[in-house]
Amino acid sequence: MPSLLNEAHRLIEQRGVRFLLTGSSARKLRRGGVNLLGGRARTRHLHPLTSYELGARFDLARVLRAGLLPSIYFSDDPRADLEAYAGTYLREEVMAEGATRNIPAFGRFLRIAALCNATMVNFTNVANDSQVPRTTVYEYFGILKDTLVLHELPAWRRSVKRKPIVSSKYYFFDPGVVASLQGRQVALGTPEYGELFETWLHHELISHRDYQSGEPLTYWRSTSGFEVDFILGDHTGVEAKAKETVGPQDLRGLAALAEEKLLERHICVSLEPRRRIVRGIEIWPYRDFIEALWSGEFGG
């Protein structure tokens, strides 16, 4: 690979050749100090399938069960394929990268990390549960981020009335993969279902950011416990609620953030069948929201 990048560099400089180079991680290359085509290459991220790409073949129940990796989404046996994917990742991705030699320890960590999906991570607890030092846990989280298995969601810090928390949250890149690693079978109405629904919505939002809008994606949580799952740029707060009937308690975070008068819109994405507005907060059916998202209503 280093010699290939050097040759690409030469052809770019001497002949003006254009290349499309793909890969799952540049971790090993960066550690080796090789030519990364600085200033001559643009980085783009390719995510699993989106609702926009699936069109009429999009099925939320299947998404939360199988995830959005193309070969698994359309598989006749997604559960078996997801289990095999986790094994392939451990064997090929981690070992080939030379990221860690202790595969059993990393395997324990990976399943504990999956249980921390969509949360602020307590690294000490993860270290204790994984039976590895905390410094190793930081290293392992770095591996997951570098290999694009895990996304870090920074905190939005502009609120004034309520002091914001500054710690990041973490999301696995695919709801099917994280559910498989957790070893869970989810049912509508359970907290686990809500977490996967939120993970799917994060996937749609981060894909839209990388493919269209380019705007920052963050989340907000106050030290007093109010939280909004996602902030689009500095204009829209979005809360994910996997409920067929959204009540006032479900809107507490959005209502608290609305008091700051910093955002233009406050939206709850839900399983409700029709759009409605409650005290300035918009409640959207998830299908309507993602159609509006990809049509550019929220930027891009």
Task: Tell me what each language-model feature is.
Residues 43-55, 76:
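Conserved AAA+ ATPase "SRH/arginine-finger" region at the nucleotide-binding site
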Residues 18-24:
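Structural recognition of the conserved hydrophobic beta-strand(s) that form the central parallel beta-sheet
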Residues 26-28, 268-275:
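Short, polar loop motifs at secondary-structure junctions
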Residues 1-8, 31-32:
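Conserved ATPase-coupling elements of RecA-like P-loop NTPase cores
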Residues 27-42, 58:
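Short regulatory helix/loop adjacent to the ATP-binding pocket of P-loop NTPases
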Residues 273-300:
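Domain-level recognition of nuclease-like catalytic cores that cleave nucleotide substrates
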Residues 233-246:
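Active-site ExK catalytic segment of metal-dependent nucleases
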Residues 80-236:
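Accessory nucleic acid-recognition modules appended to NTPase machines
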